[in-house]
Curated annotation (Swiss-Prot):
Active efflux of weakly charged organic compounds of 90 cubic Angstroms to 300 cubic Angstroms surface volume. Confers resistance to numerous chemicals including cycloheximide, sulfomethuron methyl, steroids, antiseptics, antibiotics, anticancer, herbicides, mycotoxins, insecticides, ionophores, alkaloids, flavonoids, phenothiazines, organotin compounds, carbazoles, lysosomotropic aminoesters, detergents, rhodamines and other fluorophores, azoles and other antifungals. Exhibits nucleoside triphosphatase activity. This is Pleiotropic ABC efflux transporter of multiple drugs. Residues 161-410, 869-1112 form the ABC transporter domain. It is a multi-pass membrane protein. Keywords: Antibiotic resistance, ATP-binding, Cell membrane, Cycloheximide resistance, Glycoprotein, Isopeptide bond, Membrane, Nucleotide-binding, Phosphoprotein, Repeat, Transmembrane, Transmembrane helix, Transport, Ubl conjugation. The keyword Lyase does not apply. GO terms for molecular function: ABC-type xenobiotic transporter activity; ATP binding; ATP hydrolysis activity; identical protein binding. The modification Phosphoserine is found at residues 22, 54, 58, 61, 837, 840-841, 849-850, 854. One of its GO terms (biological process) is intracellular monoatomic cation homeostasis. Changing residue 257 to I: Alters drug specificity. It holds the Pfam family ABC_trans_N.
Length: 1511
């Protein structure tokens, strides 16, 4: 990577640098005829010198200004670096980012020269920061107990009450105690401290990013005279906080990501003659060249799912983003994580160059800081548990703590020493001072008191006061003028953004179009999917409309209902994409790139084309397949209305997504809206039949007006021939037209047709005059929801973060409160709940003698290794496309009991691959060589005879530490060992790992649970409780940890080795002190080749001697042996080996000694026999039944402790079914009542998708943990895993079904039907069985679709498709008799066919029908006949229907159906088939579960005859 001179320089300087490219240009601009050219040049030079001096005076408080001063006083003018032609005169390849000779340092200096040449145009300025009495507090968790299904309502109620109560005792805890500091322009500050000490909070505080916590009332922060509120409102982009996480839009390329930022930050006062586009492109190219990203220009950034650049490159993209922003005050939170030490050093050097040349300030929090990097900082701040224990010059910090009473060991970096004083287990006290009785501060409070009384503190306060005094009106005005000069013409001067609102929309629109182009497959899939659904749904009604008579009325309404719903809810999944992009939008808002509403505006605009294409494709296919009216005007109005439906609902769902803070929060109201909007469209319940209490829903429902317009459009002005008359038959062949009537609403006696307008007026109360009203109201909703969406995006803040706390089960909290250990006030105090286990003063120091350790461990009785694990000529090859690549190349080695062996090498050397091969964890490729235990090949029990600690700390978040350890012990230790003995062993492991303080704490998630170190200890503990008989593998146990935690973990491994455990551990570039903890080293270079295997020796002398004796340069006394070794073999960035050390190793005496030792092992060790008893060679230590029992108990416990999952299920169930129940309240047995009851049964099933979508992430979470950790270690079988999922999910679904039954069955009035039929108990019980069966069916379908799918979203889409198909062909929306013959098989295989038929029959069968007055058919009987006499032949033929008055002679009122069984027969529902249908539905559930188990085995379970082969 180049010297990396930040693009912050780029924008610092370039933000206002945009001027003349040459002296000649300046001369032309300022030509004055009264002087000759020589005199003019002298005057210009004098003016620049005076201006430069003025600027220097304004920043005189900054100490290191040599580079900046030399630039301003040199008189050298910069040149325009933006070249179109390398052959142009004055071309300098050092300034061309596309040149191999590009120098970012030269580029930054050139831009500084340009700025100095015309300060009136570029408005140079600086920004410092001073803070006084800075303190911060966060909301405490009450709250420090775990939520469960039972206590969550109480917690929510209590939390709500507290918002309305004004109590003296606030529910907060202090994160930062009062502290002070000052950072002048041009200075670099490093913040050091262990995780949880408050480093991140300090950076957020001084960068005015305080969302989630509050600053103290006495806190004073000044940014060159501006307050934090001023910065947030007007100068947000000048103070930037770069978070540790790397979040980017994955489908954008690196160049597209950076050029978008550059466009949004291109200043108005840029280089003269350079347009915005050229300037932005140049900045992006400079950023890529500076950070070694040029080769990734057209590569997607990617993420964990989308393939893109590497993790390290993604981190550099994050750095480049901030660099382009050009802020004057930057805060970097662990920005070097994921970078190797050399790249991290170059990054710090870039910040230093930027500070020196451009007068910027930077604050950097680093966990592992090398000495070279530390020496670049001007100041250092050391934090411990929220206390400031030092702030001042970096070169004086070491002496300060040595004077306090601490000793810095040899070869320990200054940064490590400064943080080590905060760790009782690592720091070394000055024994001479102790002997003299001098008190050495040891607790954070004592160190803070010592600091406040020190002369260093007084010097700091002088500097702070001076800085605050210098922050006058002049400095504020300079910042303001510079900011305004950078802004585009139409940008508000008070706005913190560089470009105007519409320019932001423009650039974001371009970015979004790039996103769509780069992920065009998704758009094409959506188009294809919608076209497919149009073909399927449209073909359901194929040829039905050909008749064109009154028999098509219901189907026309049904098809229109399908159309409006499908168009409207096609945007429901947009909520997912909103939450995918939200973290990026929030990050860019803090960078002051654009308004969140501008991003929302652009996202709406960018999706218009795809939405239109999808809508047009779907509606054209659907319209003409259904055979709606063939009229151009009618068709285009239909299309217009459905497009309005698409956009109105899209904006509505976007509002829901922007109003909520998490995806799970958004899905609940979205699901509720889906139900309410669809039910009150006007088809399920006509407007006139809606109950009074809920009619308001129809009036505010945009879909109701749009559906009204669609029906009016379809039915207006058409005469539909009558398809069926009453009465009819041979006896009525010669009757007059007035003596019969058409059987549909709107029919007029004597007419052989029905006007469409009459039908919709009588059925729906729709009138043609309201046709365009729906369009107008729909458009009004589109506009209204659009602006609401923009407003919510602009002002809705994300979810607040919580301070890092431990969470305990409520029973533990009660116990602690009884003992007085915990109160609400100190519930979140780390020292009370053990957040920092090493802070207790009585903790046993780790520097005990080995003899004492041996005695202690002898009492503990940890498992000891008894066998030697060794391997020889180990090779591993994989097939990558057409190439066979060798990952491991003839690797030899062994691990003996009682030794700690390090496995080292550069990235790509094959360290983790070697561990996976040795541990039998690879699933593909070819392994050759010998892997032996005491000279004998591994058996089936080998995977559970070892411990394997993965780099990722994977644990069940709802379990406590003790429960996690016991679960491992119960399932992995031999079955013969009693539960009591296993429990005792777990307690012993807790003791040796020093986890007593948080043994009952919940694992939780980051910020609310165990911290990084505690999780790593738990990972090791889980493997130790299994009592590994052979050895323990650890993969990068120190990755991502601070140096003190890394040292603590290494000390723990040393303990275990001293007790007789064999340990093989990969480690990435350890410090000199960490290196000394290992006994042996296996060092590999790229290609999986061994370059050293042997003892390290005292101070790594044996290893150093080996390399020095084979041509390596001498290792300096103060060097880190690990870094020196990497440099020697050419594994460090920028280093080159002087020879092939693999060949050196293969020809060395040490190699021959290794081979000799392996020969002896293979010859002698087998004589000892196998260490595994014959009966203990099974794959698992416990039976399948016992495994399933324990896994089920754990899963049930997880559900109980996951109230968000269960309560979401119950709340959705309660709302949906209660809403349906009271919408169809007491539906009755009129024709419309029966129709309502059928639709109520139909709507009962729409909860399918919301319930299923909640289940899938829960399953994926369980599966990921099992497949990543528990399956490879043979903790339990996949059979136990999958059956536990079934056993635990079913009871909760039955409970949800029971809740649904009570709040759905009784309000609708099904019980009244059963009572009238004299079958109250039987039908009530049967309805309950069906209700429970449906919820179990949802769970079974969830298991089926996720069993072979990797991603929950893909499984949800598949399930939604299957459900839509099943629901569409169940016989409700179109009857089987009307369905095309091709689709009859779908009707028969749909599980919902049998469910709805049975549920409808159980709900409404065996009851008399009573028609409403408007449902009666009226006609005149022949003269001299009563209605009864006239209708008698028809009633004998039809066998259904009744007359209201058989003796009437003037007008006959006839109801077409007499019993509910007649109505049920029309939809193929028969009460006699209720149990048959129930049995069939249960068979579908069983099939889903069996298929789910099979597909899981087929797709997810490794097979013995799979892709892995051994030779």
């Amino acid at each position: 990577m180049p010297e990396a001179k930040l693009n912050n320089n780029v924008n610092d300087v370039t933000s206002y640098s945009s001027a003349s490219s040459s002296t000649e240009n300046a001369a032309d601009l300022h030509n004055y005829n009264g002087f000759d050219e020589h005199t003019e040049a002298r005057i210009q030079k004098l003016a620049r010198t005076l201006t430069a001096q003025s600027m220097q005076n304004s920043t005189q408080s900054a100490p290191n200004k040599s580079d900046a001063q030399s630039i301003f006083s040199s008189g050298v003018e910069g040149v325009n670096p933006i070249f179109s032609d390398p052959e142009a005169p004055g071309y300098d390849p050092k300034l061309d980012p596309n040149s191999e000779n590009f120098s970012s340092a030269a580029w930054v200096k050139n831009m500084a020269h340009l700025s100095a040449a015309d300060p009136d145009f570029y408005k140079p300025y600086s920004l410092g920061c001073a803070w006084k009495n800075l303190s911060a507090s966060g909301a405490s968790a009450d709250v420090a107990y775990q939520s469960t299904v039972v206590n969550i309502p109480y917690k929510i109620l209590k939390s709500g009450l507290r918002k309305f109560q004004r109590s003296k005792e606030t529910n907060t805890f202090q994160i930062l105690k009062p502290m002070d500091g000052c950072l002048n322009p041009g200075e670099l500050l490093v913040v050091l401290g262990r995780p949880g000490s408050g480093c991140t909070t300090l950076l957020k505080s001084i960068s005015s990013n305080t969302h989630g916590f509050d600053l103290g009332a006495d806190t004073k922060i000044s940014y060159s005279g501006y307050s934090g509120d001023d910065i947030k409102k007007h100068f947000r982009g000048e103070v930037v906080y770069n978070a540790e996480a790397d979040v980017h839009l994955p489908h954008l390329t690196v160049f597209e990501t950076l050029v978008t930022v550059a466009r949004l930050k291109t200043p108005q006062n840029r280089i003269k003659g350079v347009d915005r586009e050229s300037y932005a492109n140049h900045l992006a190219e400079v950023a890529m060249a500076t950070y070694g990203l040029s080769h990734t220009r057209n590569t997607k950034v990617g993420n964990d799912i989308v393939r893109g650049v590497s993790g390290g490159e993604r981190k550099r993209v994050s750095i480049a983003e901030v660099s382009i922003c050009g802020s004057k005050f930057q805060c970097w939170d662990n920005a070097t994580r994921g970078l190797d030490s050399a790249t991290a050093l170059e990054f710090i050097r870039a910040l230093k160059t930027q500070a020196d040349i451009s007068n910027t300030s930077a604050t950097v929090a680093i966990y592992q800081c090398s000495q070279d990097a530390y020496d670049l900082f001007n100041k250092v701040c050391v934090l411990d548990d929220g206390y400031q224990i030092y702030y001042g010059p970096a070169d004086k910090a070491k002496k300060y703590f040595e004077d306090m009473g601490y000793v810095c060991p040899s070869r320990q970096t200054t940064a490590d020493f400064l943080t080590s004083v905060t760790s009782p287990s690592e720091r070394t006290l000055n024994k001479d001072m102790l002997k003299k009785g001098i008190h050495i501060p040891q607790t954070p409070k004592e160190m803070n008191d010592y600091w406040v009384k020190s002369p260093n503190y007084k010097e700091l306060m002088k500097e702070v006061d001076q800085r605050l005094l210098n922050d006058d009106e002049a400095s504020r005005e300079a910042i303001k003028e510079a900011h305004i000069a950078k802004q585009s013409k139409r940008a508000r001067p008070s706005s913190p953004y560089t470009v105007s609102y519409m320019m932001q929309v423009k650039y974001l629109l371009i970015r979004n179009m790039w996103r769509l182009r780069n992920n065009i497959g998704f758009t094409l899939f959506m188009i294809l999917g919608n076209c497919s659904m149009a073909l399927i749904l449209g073909s359901m009604f194929f040829k039905i409309m050909k008749k064109g008579d009154t028999s098509t009325f219901y189907f026309r309404g049904s098809a229109m209902f399908f159309a409006i719903l499908f168009n409207a809810f096609s945007s429901l999944l947009e909520i997912f994409s909103l939450y995918e992009a939200r973290p990026i939008t929030e990050k860019h808002r803090t960078y002051s790139l654009y308004h969140p509403s501008a991003d929302a505006f652009a996202s709406v605009l960018s999706e218009i084309p795809s939405k239109l294409i999808i809508a047009v494709c779907f509606n054209i296919i659907f319209y003409f397949l259904v055979d709606f009216r063939r009229n151009g005007g009618v068709f285009f109005f239909y299309l217009l209305i459905n497009i309005v439906a698409v956009f109105s609902m899209s904006h509505l769902f976007r509002c829901v997504g922007s109003l909520t803070k998490t995806l799970s929060e958004a899905m609940v109201p979205a699901s509720m809206l889906l139900l309410a909007l669809s039910m009150y469209t006007g088809f399920a319940i006509p407007k006139k039949k809606i109950l009074r209490w809920s009619k308001w829903i129809w009036y505010i429902n945009p879909l109701a007006y749009l559906f009204e317009s669609l029906l009016i459009n379809e039915f207006h002005g058409i005469k539909f021939p009558c398809a069926e008359y009453v009465p009819r038959g041979p006896a009525y062949a010669n009757i007059s037209s007035t003596e019969s009537v058409c059987t549909v609403v709107g029919a007029v006696p004597g007419q052989d047709y029905v006007l469409g307008d009459d039908f919709i007026r009588g059925t729906y109360q729709y009138y043609h005059k309201d046709k365009w009203r729906g369009f107008g109201i729909g458009m009004a909703y589109v506009v209204f929801f659009f602006f609401v969406y923009l407003f919510l995006c602009e002002y809705n803040e994300g979810a607040k973060q919580k301070g890092e706390i431990l969470v305990f089960p409520r029973s533990i909290v009660k116990r602690m409160k009884k003992r007085g250990v915990l109160t609400e006030k100190n519930a979140n105090d780390p020292e009370n709940v053990g957040e920092r286990s090493d802070l207790s003063s009585d903790r046993k120091m780790l520097q005990e003698s080995s003899e004492e350790e041996s005695d202690t461990y002898g009492e503990i009785g940890l498992s000891k290794s008894e066998a030697i694990f060794h391997w020889r000529n180990l090779c591993y090859e994989v097939q990558i496309k057409a190439e066979t690549r060798r990952i491991l190349n003839n690797v030899d080695g062994w691990v003996k009991p009682g030794t700690l062996t390090a496995l080292m090498g550069a990235s790509g050397a094959g360290k983790t691959t070697l561990l996976d091969c040795l541990a039998e964890r690879v699933t593909m490729g070819v392994i050759t060589g010998d892997i032996l235990v005491n000279g004998i090949p591994r058996d089936k029990s080998f995977p559970r005879s070892i411990g394997y600690c993965q780099q990722q700390d994977l644990h069940l978040k709802t379990a406590t530490v003790r429960e996690s350890l016991r679960f491992s012990a119960y399932l992995r230790q031999p079955a013969e060992v009693s539960i009591e003995e296993k429990n005792r062993y777990v307690e012993e492991v807790i003791k040796i790992l020093e986890m007593e303080k948080y043994a009952d704490a919940v694992v939780g998630v980051a910020g609310e649970g165990l911290n990084v170190e505690q999780r790593k200890r738990l990972t090791i503990g889980v493997e130790l409780t299994a009592k590994p008989k052979l050895l323990v593998f650890l993969d990068e146990p120190t990755s991502g940890l601070d140096s003190q935690t890394a040292w603590s973990i290494c000390q723990l491994m040393k303990k275990l080795a001293n007790h007789g455990q064999a340990i093989l551990c990969t480690i990435h570039q350890p410090s000199a002190i960490l290196m000394q903890e290992f006994d042996r080293l296996l060092f590999m270079q790229r290609g999986g080749k061994t370059v050293y295997f042997g003892d390290l020796g005292e101070g790594c002398k044996t290893m150093i001697d080996y390399f020095e004796s084979h041509g390596a340069h001498k290792c300096p006394a103060d060097a880190n042996p690990a870094e020196w070794m990497l440099e020697v073999v050419g594994a460090a960035p920028g280093s080159h080996a002087n020879q092939d050390y693999y060949e050196v190793w293969r020809n060395s005496e040490e190699y021959r000694a290794v081979q000799s030792e392996l020969d002896w092992m293979e010859r002698e060790l087998p004589k000892k026999g196998s260490i595994t008893a014959a009966e203990d060679k099974h794959e698992f230590s416990q039976s399948i039944i016992y495994q399933t029992k324990l896994v089920s108990i754990r899963l049930f416990q997880q559900y109980w402790r996951s109230p968000d999952y269960l309560w979401s299920k119950f709340i959705l169930t309660i709302f949906n079914q209660l809403f349906i129940g009271f919408t169809f309240f007491k539906a009755g047995t009129s024709l419309q009542g029966l129709q309502n009851q059928m639709l109520a049964v139909f709507m009962f099933t729409v909860i399918f998708n919301p319930i299923l979508q909640q289940y899938l992430p829960s399953f994926v979470q369980q599966r990921d943990l099992y497949e990543a950790r528990e399956r490879p270690s043979r903790t339990f079988s996949w059979i136990s895993f999958i059956f536990a999922q079934i056993f635990v999910e079913v009871p909760w679904n039955i409970l949800a079904g029971t809740i649904a039954y009570f709040i759905y069955y009784y309000p609708i009035g099904f019980y009244s039907n059963a009572s009238a039929a004299g079958q109250l108990h039987e039908r009530g019980a049967l309805f309950w069985l069906f209700s429970c069966a449906f919820y179990v069916y949802v769970g079974s379908m969830g298991l089926l679709v996720i069993s072979f799918n990797q991603v929950a979203e893909s499984a949800a889409n598949l399930a939604s498709l299957l459900f839509t198909m099943s629901l569409s062909f169940c016989g409700v929306m179109t009857t089987p008799s009307a369905m095309p013959r091709f689709w009859i098989f779908m009707y028969r295989v749909s599980p919902l066919t049998y469910f709805i038929q049975a549920l409808l029959a159980v709900g409404v069968a065996n009851v008399d029908v009573k028609c409403a007055d408007y449902e009666l058919l009226e006609f005149t009987p022949p003269s001299g006949m009563t209605c009864g006499q006239y209708m008698e032949p028809y009633l004998q033929l039809a066998k259904t229907g009744y007359l209201t008055d058989e003796n009437a002679t003037d007008t006959c009122s006839f109801c077409q159906i007499s019993t509910t069984n007649d109505y049920l027969a029309n939809v193929n529902s028969f009460y006699s088939e209720r149990w048959r249908n129930y049995g069939i539905f249960i068979c579908y559930i069983a099939f889903n579960y069996i298929a789910g188990v099979f597909f899981y085995w087929l797709a997810r379970v490794p097979k013995k005859n799979g892709k892995l082969s051994k030779k």
